């Protein structure tokens, strides 16, 4: 009976150790994923800002070109 208790205790102990190692690993992976998500959000925000500025400049250039063409046709 004592042998069974010791064996059961050993199995439970090893299971808990294994579980805690897995939990630490999972936490590390979650932290890495969170860092990757934050970096991708920052990149996305930079691209969004850049595209807005490029769109604004391109829109102004097209508007000026159309205005110039309209003015030339009126003369």
From Swiss-Prot:
Domain of life of the native organism: Eukaryota
Pro-peptide region(s): 23-42
Tissue specificity statement from the Swiss-Prot or TrEMBL entry: Expressed by the skin glands.
GO biological process: defense response to bacterium
Keyword Transport: no
Compartmental location: Secreted
Signal peptide: 1-22
Gene Ontology cellular component list: extracellular region
Family to which this protein belongs: Belongs to the frog skin active peptide (FSAP) family. Dermaseptin subfamily.
Known function: Possesses a potent antimicrobial activity against Gram-positive and Gram-negative bacteria. Probably acts by disturbing membrane functions with its amphipathic structure.
Protein name: Dermaseptin-DA2
């Amino acid at each position: 009976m004592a042998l069974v208790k010791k064996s059961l205790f050993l199995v439970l102990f090893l299971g808990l150790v294994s579980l805690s190692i897995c939990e630490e690993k999972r936490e590390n992976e979650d932290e890495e994923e969170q860092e990757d998500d934050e970096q991708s959000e920052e990149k996305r925000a930079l691209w969004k800002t850049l595209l807005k500025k490029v769109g604004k400049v391109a829109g102004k250039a097209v508007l000026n070109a159309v205005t110039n063409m309209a003015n030339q046709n009126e003369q």
